[in-house]
Amino acid sequence: MAIPNRKVVITAYGPPSTALQFVTEDLPPPPKDHVQVKILYAGFAGADVNMRLGVYPMQSAPPFTPGYCFAGRVSVNGPGSGKFEPGTLVTALTKYDSDAEYINIPEKYLLAIPDGVDPKVAAALPVDWSTAYGMVHRAAKVSEGQRVFIHGISGAVGQAVMYLSLLQGATVYGTASERNHAALKEAGAHPYLYTNKDWIAAMKDLGGVHAVFDALGFESFDESYSILTPKERSVVVAYGNNLSNLTGAKRRSPWIPMAKLLFKNLYFWSNKGAIFYFITRDQKTFEPELQLLLNMTRDGIITPPIKAVWEFDDIKEAHEAWCKGSGMGSPVIRIARDA
C-alpha cells in the first residue's frame, strides 16, 4: 500500500525561500530488494547547499529532493529483502532523497546502527566522517609526526579530518573563525584566522606541511599548494569549491581551477601532488569504512560532535545559516517528530 510522504523538493536553483518547497506525494511499497525506511535524521552538508545553487558537480537538474544521507528505522521490507527486521536502526548514503519522511532504498546500501550510537550522530557519519576518513587514511596517508593543514577546521568535514589526523599522531593546523579558536585549541589543533593570510608564512616557516585539506577551491588551491613541504611526499586533498559560500562572491565555474590543480601532478620531479577527493556509496571502500566509523563511535574512540539540530519544518533556515554561527561539528535535520 502506498503511503503519504512529505518531502522537500528543489524546484529551481536559487535562495532557500524560493528554491525549497514542501510537497506530499504517495510513496509506493518498496520494490524487489529494497527496504522502506522511516527517516529520523537527515545529514546536512555543503553538497545540499551547492545543489540548491546548481553548482554541485554532475548533479541532477530540478526538480529533485535533496538530502545526502540519513539515519532511520526500517519500516517495510520489499520482496527479496530480509536482512533487517522492521524497527532496526539503519544509516545510508543516498546523495538525494533523504530530506523526506520515508525512503525506498536498495537493501545493499543500508548499514545497521550499533546499539548505543545516537541516530543523529549516525546521520553525520556517511558524508562528513566517511569523507574525512578516506582523505586522511587513503588520499593523504596521514601518519605520526606529520604536519596537516585544514581549511575550515571547525566545519563538518574539517573537524572530522582534525580528529582523525590527531588520532594518527599528526600535528594539526587550520583556519577558522576566531569564535571557534578556544575549542579548537582545547581539541589539540593550532588555529589561524581565515580572514588573513598569516598562516601561509607560518606554515612555510615550519618547512611546509605534508597534507592540506581544501574545501574552498579557486584561488585557495594555489595557496594550499604553496605551503606543501618540498622535502617529502606531500599532497593537496581538494574536496570542494565552497569559497563563494564564505565570501558571498559571484558564482564561478570550478572546472578550470580544478584542472589547474590536478595539472601540477605532471611535475614528475616534485614531491608535491594533488588529489580531488569524493565518495560514492558504490566505492568498494565505502561500506567497510562507514562500518568502522560506526564501530569507533560505539566504542568511544571518536565522538562526532553535532553542531545543530534543525527541525524539518525549518530546513530553509538551516540553508540560510550554512557557514554561520559558532560551534563545531555536523548539522543535522530532525525529520521525524518522535526521533
Curated annotation (Swiss-Prot):
GO cellular component, one term: mitochondrion
Induction: During mycoparasitism.
Protein name as annotated: Protein indc11
PANTHER family given in the database record: QUINONE OXIDOREDUCTASE-LIKE PROTEIN 2, SHORT-CHAIN DEHYDROGENASE/REDUCTASE
Superkingdom, taxonomy of origin: Eukaryota
Source organism per UniProt: Hypocrea atroviridis (Trichoderma atroviride)
GO MF assignments: oxidoreductase activity
